[in-house]
Structure formats: structure tokens, C-alpha cells
Amino acid sequence: MNEYVDKIKKLMEKEMVRYVIAGGMTTAVNLVSFFVLRLVTDLSRSAANIIAIMLAILFAYFANGFYVFRSEQRKSVGRIIREFISFVGMRLFAMVVEVVGTNLLCDSFRYNEFISKIIIQVVVLVINYIFSKCFVFKKDKKPVKDILADNYIMIIAFIIPAIFMFVLWVVAEIGPFGGHSLTMVDSLHQYLPFFSDYHDKLVNEGSLFYTWDIGMGSNLLDIIAYYMACPLNFIIVLFSREHLYIAMCVLISIKIALSGMTMASYLGYKCRNKNNLLIIPFAVAYALSNYVIGYSWNLMWMDCILILPLIMQGFEQMMEDGSNYRLYTLSLFYGLLCNYYICFMICVFLVLQFILTNHKNIYKGAEDTLRFAGTSVMAAAMSAFLLIPAYIGINTTASATRHFPKWEWYGSIWDMIKQMFVLTEPIKSQQFDGGVNLYCGTFAILLIGIYIFNTKIKWYEKLKNVILIVFLMMSFNNTLLNYIWHGFHDQYGIPNRFSFLFIFILLSMGYEAIANTDKKQIPGIALGIIVAFGLLVYADKNIDMDRTVIILTWVLFAVYSAGILVLVLVRGKGRFAVAAILSVLCLTEIVFSAAKGYESNGTVNIPDYYGDAASVQAAIDSVKTGHFPYRTELNNTKVVDESTYYNMQGVSLFGSTVSNDLVNAMHGLGFYTGANEFLFDGANPVSSSVLGIRYLFRRQDEHMSYDMDYVDTVDGVDVYQNSRALKLGFMVNNELKDWTSDASNMFDSINNFVEKSTGVAGTFSQIYPEVTGSSNDITITHDNPYSEYFGLSDITPGIVSFGLSFDITEEQNDLYIIANCNGITKIRIYVNGEEQNYERLQYQTYHVGHLIKGTNVEVEYYFSAGVPDNTSARLTIATLNGAAFDQAYEGWADNQLNINKFEDGYVKGHISVDEAGLMFTSIPYDSGWTAYVDGRKTDIQTVAGAFIALDLEKGDHVIEFKYFPRGLKSGLIFTFAGWLVFALLMNAKTIKEKRGSKKGKPEDEDRTDDEAAIE
């Protein structure tokens, strides 16, 4: 008996056994608490989960601290408090994993609650063990004050940008200080609405795979992968929807500050001295460069900006010591996870770095190649659960069609060098693709020559970096190279998105130059200074630059040159003082320029766009009862994706993941479309019926052009109803499979859709009234009365306009027009001299109104500057044939899909089919959908590759649609394999290191400090 007791005691001495016992008891506390709360209270799954986890955390701390990871030494109160704070912090991270993971399995994978909870408990158990063992109860853990002392430079490099951003918040009245925001351009029109939908899914336990709130129905995983994959984004659950813009500004500010810290870490490693005071200005310059000031509203890009220094630090560690690849793998994984688009540019940069790295000999080169390729593939595999679905999705977009541009230059290279100088305004958006953000401090320019002439820096390192900055500068100015850097994609108004790589190299070179200065380098320093001043003289003569910039650069060059020379000559405490003064001067320039940059960028006043959000939401709620299988829209949006912001099941979508086939189909139905967008603008009775748009909300100061019935006014917002909104699916003729959206005339395309689906012809009839042109700026010609095109010539330079007017000649007309022209900005429409509308109308259908004979209609076209001469404008005029539309609607409405269950990524309903044919649905086609008819899986058909359709036989049928993101299964397999390989490699490395340390361990190593002192 005693033998068994001794065995049990020995077994209990093993830490892993104790952890399994304590972990099992903690899991029991968690599970029992969770299911009791779910059974006896009305708490939501997430709320019950959080309470259960908090109870488990309290139990687990004492179990782990005093039973599992027990120490022979008596713990001080301070250590207990520190351990408790660390433990709770780590467990809170695990709580996020558990809550999100449970909801993901329940709502996205549709697993049972109990099964989901058990699966996640296993994952959390592993995470908690690693954190407790390696961080919380680590026996040789450093005191906090020692950690702070060892890393004070990195901390300062974080604090300075953080303080700058806080002051910016106060001065620019951002967030709680005045309602302004850093979310501008696409961040306002795309990201904020997408974050709203993401927020809704996280808070209300929705699917993270699919959403009906974006573009009629979209793959949410694709959108998360492109815009919102950063783990830090989970903080949005702490904010209400109306304060999400504040959460986004917080994220931007945190990432900017972290960029300073990571750059400081890299520079400290680069020159093997992490406590050099001069690191600070270079790190802050990276965090507050013009690239960051201009483009930080792309908050998902900032993850890659902040992780780049760690990727490069890990890369260089790996090249020096082949076994040291953990930092590289994990940091590259983080970059790929957070934003694969910008990380693609980093990967191209890494390949160039690797090619230009000195591998010493062919054997080392082969070994480095295998290691670099292997760890890079491993990092990609670890993030494959997002990368593979995202790659499949991006290949359905317009950008998947690659048209390589010619080898051409945007302009003079000196125009780009000009962007490196102080007081250069950062670019936040620009149509010219040759624009670039390069400024990161005048001292960075000065140090280029000093770096080149520094004899302490290895020649091949200098050659590598010079080649890289020259190649990058070429790429900024070259159409083909630019296209490749941007992922074989056009830039669309945000030029040279990879210029942060140039800034990174420039600052790295600059710091390496100044960190390796001594008296022997004075000749090289002098030559470098001469080169810098020579560049400035040339720039003054050959570049159109403001005199203030030239003078200020002269002054800064002189001051920095003097400071560097004094730094070289002085030793001891004097050198530290000079370094401190020089750092302060550099920081002053950077902070001043950043302040001017943000002043130039401006901010967005959120109340201008969402000031009436409560009223709009009240109107939406007046007709919305939970999830419903019909669509709603806003009459005139203030931001492009505004319907998504309100979590409406709308039509519009402006985003980088939009399907090209869907864009083309929406164009064919009369909507406004762009390269990566389709909007509700252009809706007409046919498209509104087919897509099931039942309600429209109109702010009372807006013009209403859509033909719908007024229902009510709720808090100043008018509610309109489309009585002919069809259900999600309905029967049509098989001929609709042959419909294409490529007709040159939208009215013809719509007529074709109606005729193929119902057999009814002539829904829209094009008319040709006598049109009169008028303009003081343009000569207008119209030779053929049956042509919808009007010649434009003799165009006056500058902003111009012209008008086309006509009279109604029939008794009754339900009039629609299409008005467009290259270079157009807005169109103004008058009916009998009274302005009806003035907005951005492009190639889309527009409802002028129900007009009677003799009514005059005038359409004015307004252009931006630079309209090409000898171009043409288009005015297509048509009337809606009410009888034909009524007949078509009756044909569609006869056999509709009645919905029984409607969730994100899941639809179930029944339909009675009078005659075998095609069931058209307004569900956007995605290969992730699977269809079932009467319980049997069936092939999905498509209409124009854009909408899902099913072949159905006569009779009653139960229809079911299930969604699972394409590529996710294989992605999860690769991710599991990648992490497994990484864990095995790390474990093997740890075992090897322990064995090595034991072999070299002296016999008396186990003695205490007191014993050693006695001897």
C-alpha cells in the first residue's frame, strides 16, 4: 500500500501532472458555472461565458500559484501581487480567445454549445499552461524595475509618439474632446461601416463567416482578412456603435506609438546597443513619418508598419544564427494575419534583402535559402486559415484581371526626392500615381553620405542598402514596377503604398552611420556633409521648392552637421550631453513636422456624417423586427457604405473584396458601379423588385427620385415602401441563365433581363425628343437625332459645364435618363426650371419623374479641370412601360420562396412550383454556398455569374442554403500543421539547449549564493 502511495507522491511531484489536475478542476468550475447560468438565468451566451471564466480565473490563480508552480522560497507580498496581475492579464487574453472561439464555433461553424465549449477548453488549457509556465510563475523572472531599466529607450520611443497623439487628440478635438476623427477618406466610407458590422457580430453573437448587411450578402471572413484581422481590434466590443470611430482612433494612435517601440528594438539590435540615446529620434521619425501621417487612416496597414522592424530584426538574427528564427516566423505570421496586402510588399522586400545578403559561401547560401524559404512558408501556413480564403476571394474581384502596364515613368525623379524635405505636406489621397510620402527627418538625408563614407560599416551592407533605396526610388516613379509592388493591382488614389520600406531603410542607414562614428570617421563625415549640401544646392536650382523649405533645410543641415562633429570629438559625460541635445533637436523637427502634417490632413467631423444616426436608427427600427429576408436602403447616403453602418440588409458595397461579376451584373440592372463598388444609386422599379428592396429611408432635406410609396415619418426620417419587393427567391424562365450584363445601353440590359426571365418585352422604351445644347465653355454638336451621343469640342480650359434640354411630347411619361461623360463630377437636373437634384450621377439610371406633355427637362453636366477636347457626352432618355412591368411582376410573384429560417450564412424555405424552371435568388453568388432541395444536395446555377439560381421541377420543395467560406477547411489544416511544426521545432530547440547547458554545468552550480559566499 505504501508503495502505491509513494508512487502517487512521486507522480504528484511532476509539474505537468499537477497542472492537469488543477486545469481539470478549473475547467469544471468554468463549465458548471456556465451551464448553470445558461439554465437558470436569461443571460446571453457571452455574458454567461465571461462570468464563468472570471470565477475560473480566481480559482485557477490559487491552484496554479500555490499548488502547480510552487516555489520553495517564500513569496513576498509584492511578488504575489505582481503574479496576480500578470496571471489575470494573461487569463483575460485567454478569456477573449474563449468567448470569441465559443461564439465562432456556435454561430459560424454551427456547432452545439456544449461541444463548442469543450473544444475551446482544450485550446485555453494549452494557452494557460504556456503563459503560466513561461511568464507568470517563471522562477527566474526579472523584477519589473529591472525590465524597465533594460528597455527604457524602447519605452521612451513609445511614450513620445503616444504623448504626441494625445496632444493631437486634444488640439484637433478628436473623440471625446470634440467629435472629430482620424477616420478619413476610405476609413470613413468603408472601414467604419465594416467595423460596425464586425462589432454587431461580436457583441450579438453573429456569424463571422457571412453577413447580409454588406452588399446584399458578403463573405465576412474575406472582409475581416482585408480590413479587421488584427487581434487588437477586439477592443471595439468595449465601445458602443456611435463611439466606434473613437475606438478606431485609439487603435491608430496605439499602433503609431508601438511603431516607435519596435523600431527602437530593431535599431538597438542592429548596432548591438539598445540603450543608445540616439535611437529615440530615429524610432520616433519612423513612427511619425509622412507615410504614417498621410496613410495612418488605413489602420489595418499600421499593423504591418509596426511589425516590419521586428520582421527585419528576426530576419537578421536568422541570417546570423540559423537556429534563431522564432522572432522572424512569429512577426511575419503577425503581418500576414493582420493585412496580407501590405505584407505582400514586405515579402517582396524580404526577397530583395535575402538576394542582396552576403551569404559568405555557397554552402551557407544554400542553408540560408532553405531556412528562409522554410520559415517564410511556415509563417504563411500558420496564417493560412485567413490567407487561403482571402486569396480565393481576391481572385473574384476586378483586380484579379491583370493588365500589365508599359515600362513608363510618372515624371522626374527629382519630384520624388523633393518629398524627402522638411515641411512637405503628407499625401492622404491623390489621383496622381506618382505621388509619394518620403519625409522622415532632415537628419536622415544628411546621414546618407556619412553612411556611405563610413569605413566601419561593411562595404557589402552599404552596397545592399544603396541598391535597395535606388531600386525603391525607381519603383515609385515607374508604372510597371509600381504595379508589381502593389500586388499586381492599380493604386486607385493612394499612391506608392510601399514607401514605408524606403523610410525604414533610410532611417536604419542613418542610425547605423551615427552609431558608428568616431574620430577616425571625421574625413568620411566631412565628405558626407559636403555631399548633402551639394544635393541641397542642386535641389535649389533644379526643383521647384518653397524658399522656406530651402532655408530651413540649410539651417538644419548646418546644426546637425555641427552636432555630429561635436559628438565625435567629445567623450564621457560630455558625449551623452551632446547626444541628448542632438536627439532633442531631431525630435523637435519630427514633432513639428508631424503637427504640420496633421494640420494639413485635417480631421473628419463625425456629427456631419452621423449626427442624425439616432433618427435614422429609429426609422429603421420602426420596420425591422429581427433578421428579415428583405432589403432596405437609404435614399441618399452621407458615407458610401452607410447602410452597413446601421446593420441594414442593404444593397450598396464599396470595398476591395467585391466580386467583379456582381459589379457587372449590378451595372446591367442600372446601378452606379465602379472598379470595386456598386451602389444603390441608379435603382429602378425592375431592380428594386428583383432584389427585394422593400423599404427606403429619406432624410427630409433630401430629394426623393425613387418611385416608392410614402408610409410614415419617424423622428424626421421619411419611410417609403416598395409594394412590389419580391422575396429572396422566385421562379423565372430558364432563358435567364443566358442573360449577360454587357449591353452598351442599361435600358436594353434591363429589358433583356425582364424578357428572358418572364417573356415580357419592352419594359423600358427609349425615346428621342429634340435636344438643345447650351454652354459658354463648349461647342456641342448632335448630327443624328436618333443618337444619344453629343460631340464636345473647343473646350475652354478649367472647370466647365454645359446643358442639354428637351420637352416632353407625349401625354404621360414615367421618365428615366442615363447621363454620363468622361471627367464628369456632378449633374444638375431641372424640371420646368426647378432644380430636382445635384449630385454625383454617372453611368446609372435616374428617375426624373411622372411628367406630362409640355414639361421641360434640362440636364447640366459639370466637369473637373482638364477635360480632353473632342470627346462626347451621353444622354439616354427612356420611359417605363407600366403595363409591361405589371405583367412581368405578376410572372415573378406567382411562385416565390417562402422563408422559414433566415440567418447569416443560412437560409431555409419552401416553394410551390407550377411549372419546372429556374428559381432565381438575389443571393450574390459565392462558391462557399451549398444548396439542398428536399434534403438532397443540388448543383448551383448562376445568372451572369453574379446571382445564385436553382433548377427546380414542378411541385412543392424545401430549399436550404448553407454557407462555409471556400478555402477555410484547407486553410485550417495548413494552420494546424504550421503551428504544430513550429511548436515541435521550438520544443526540440529548448531540449537541445537544456542538454547543452547540463553538459557544461559545473559541479557546484546547484549551490546557493550563501554557500558560495561562505567558501
Where in the sequence are the language-model features?
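Periplasmic/ER-lumenal interhelical loops and adjacent helix-loop junctions
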Residues: 185, 190, 196-198, 231, ...
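Contiguous transmembrane helix-bundle modules in multi-pass membrane proteins
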Residues: 342, 463-474, 479-480, 489-615, ...
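Active-site-proximal, structured, solvent-exposed surfaces of multi-pass membrane proteins
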Residues: 146-147, 772-1015
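Membrane-interface micro-motifs in multi-pass membrane enzymes
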Residues: 221-225, 246-258, 278, 285-309, ...
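Transmembrane alpha-helical segments
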Residues: 259-267, 307-319, 348-356, 445-452, ...
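Membrane-interface coil-to-helix junctions
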Residues: 162-263, 284-305, 394-398, 407-432, ...
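Membrane-embedded helix bundles of polyisoprenyl
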Residues: 161, 253-270, 275-360, 371-396, ...
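Extracytoplasmic/lumenal acceptor-recognition loop(s) of multi-pass membrane glycoenzymes
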Residues: 585-606, 621-690, 726-727, 731-757, ...
